[in-house]
């Protein structure tokens, strides 16, 4: 998808690790497995005669529909991961994401209060982390998921240093 309309000119985006697709797929599989299992319970209960409602077509249709939605997400996940990027500029950090609804967020270094790194079990197993930026604004939800752990640590130190330098200049 073209992004020229929202991308600032002259920016070279750094992309997150392709291994982040695996993290998203594991999360997808666990969540959807539980969802389809729960939505299939009425089908099981109707088939063994415990319930008379819902009708068989509805008991089959609801989990089938959710399974189709889950498979659609399966197709989208690799594209969503490829759309995530970031760029460091002199005074701010740019973060982009989205396929259909694209977004570019600009976080000035002087507004950063602290930079946090987190990693769940799947991320840790793949050597990845998520970098979160906390600013003075409660509404800021800036983060870069799927970074290699070394890049996340480097970025955390660099952004913290830049934030302190800009904050001291205020």
Ranges and model annotations:
Residues 1-110, 114-170:
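N-terminal basic, Ser/Thr-rich segments that initiate or prime the first beta/alpha elements at protein or domain
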């Amino acid at each position: 998808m073209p992004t020229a309309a929202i991308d600032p000119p002259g920016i070279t985006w750094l992309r997150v690790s392709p291994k982040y697709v695996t993290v998203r797929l594991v999360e997808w599989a666990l969540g959807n497995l539980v969802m389809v299992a729960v939505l299939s319970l009425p089908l099981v209960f109707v088939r063994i005669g415990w319930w008379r409602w819902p009708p068989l077509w509805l008991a089959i249709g609801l989990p089938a529909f959710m399974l189709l939605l889950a498979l659609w997400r399966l197709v989208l996940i690799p594209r969503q991961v490829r759309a995530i990027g970031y760029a460091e500029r002199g005074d701010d950090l740019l973060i982009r994401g989205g396929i259909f609804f694209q977004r570019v967020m600009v976080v000035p270094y002087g507004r950063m209060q602290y930079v946090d790194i987190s990693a769940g079990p799947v991320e840790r197993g793949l050597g990845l982390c998520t970098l979160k930026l906390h600013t003075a604004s409660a509404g800021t939800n800036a983060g870069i998921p799927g970074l290699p752990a070394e890049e996340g640590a480097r970025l955390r130190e660099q952004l913290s240093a830049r934030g302190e330098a800009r904050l001291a200049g205020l």
